[in-house]
Amino acid sequence: AVDDYAATRYPIILVHGLTTDSKYGGVVEYXYRNPNDLTSHXXAAYVYELRSDPLD
């Protein structure tokens, strides 16, 4: 079916890369619209933000 074309067996975990922020330059989201698109088509997608200082 068209509504579940993105369904996966395991969840998708999105984590930002080079920057320690979820946005490039504080403006553009790192994962853009991908998490919303995936979840709207039956995929389990999670976005995680890592802090630069885990003791902070």
From Swiss-Prot:
Its EC number is 3.1.1.3. InterPro entries: AB_hydrolase_fold (IPR029058). It is an enzyme of class 3 (hydrolase). Thermostable. GO terms for molecular function: triacylglycerol lipase activity. Gene3D superfamilies: alpha/beta hydrolase. It catalyses: a triacylglycerol + H2O = a diacylglycerol + a fatty acid + H(+). This thermostable and solvent-tolerant lipase is rather nonspecific. It can synthesize both primary and secondary alcohol esters. Simple triglycerides of short and middle chain fatty acids (C<13) are the preferred substrates. This is Lipase, thermostable. It comes from Burkholderia cepacia (Pseudomonas cepacia).
